[in-house]
């Protein structure tokens, strides 16, 4: 079976600091992987390298057997369509209402019209147990737990084949941590 994601001997340094030192891993379709490590151990650097936000110093990163290291942004478009991402800080735009944050990729990358994009946002928000009363709010008006849910809705809105979560429960109380973990399990099954 061909790996969905394959990293081979991936290295990344920042000045004298070696962050990724020969990382090798394969993740098959349908498989989940949790990467655990201390602060500064390279978890986020590895994710950003897979996402194409950082370029490794050496090594290979393949998605569906397609080399992504060195691939121009334009060449990544079909790969990026397969990927959803929930960033640690949510990475929502306060200048946009919740629904436009959720449907951001569909509007910006796919040229979806606003009516369809709003419907897409409603559906994704429903999947993370949020209602339509939030659609026109700014993310700045949301609680921490709601902010994470909106970020999760954005990550799943395009129904990606691959979803990355970078510390999705950081900063949440234990009850909201359980809620977010439950929603993640439900959304990725």
Q: Residue spans of the language-model regions?
A:
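ABC ATPase NBD coupling module
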Residues: 68-84, 114
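Conserved catalytic motifs of ABC-family nucleotide-binding domains
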Residues: 159
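Conserved ABC ATPase signature
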Residues: 138-142, 146
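Catalytic Walker B motif of ABC-type/P-loop ATPase nucleotide-binding domains
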Residues: 163-166
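Helix-to-loop junction immediately C-terminal to a conserved catalytic motif
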Residues: 51
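Helix N-cap at the start of a conserved alpha-helix in ABC-type nucleotide-binding domains
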Residues: 174-176
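Conserved ABC ATPase "signature" region
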Residues: 67, 115-133
């Amino acid at each position: 079976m061909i790996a969905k994601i394959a990293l081979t001997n991936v290295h990344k340094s920042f000045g004298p600091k070696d962050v990724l030192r020969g990382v090798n891993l394969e993740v098959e379709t349908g498989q989940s992987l949790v990467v655990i490590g201390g602060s500064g151990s390279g978890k986020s650097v590895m994710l950003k390298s897979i996402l194409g936000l950082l370029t490794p110093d050496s090594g290979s990163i393949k998605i569906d057997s397609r080399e992504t290291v060195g691939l121009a942004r334009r060449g990544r478009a079909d790969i990026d369509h397969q990927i959803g991402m929930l960033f640690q800080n949510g990475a929502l735009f306060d200048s946009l209402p919740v629904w436009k944050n959720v449907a951001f990729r569909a509007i910006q990358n796919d040229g979806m019209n606003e009516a369809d994009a709003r419907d897409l946002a409603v559906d994704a928000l429903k999947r993370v147990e949020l209602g339509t009363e939030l659609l026109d709010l700014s993310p700045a008006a949301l609680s921490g737990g709601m902010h994470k849910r909106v970020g999760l809705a954005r990550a799943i809105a395009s129904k990606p084949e691959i979803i990355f979560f970078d510390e999705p429960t950081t900063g949440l109380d234990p009850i909201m941590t359980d809620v977010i973990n439950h929603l993640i399990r439900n959304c990725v099954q």
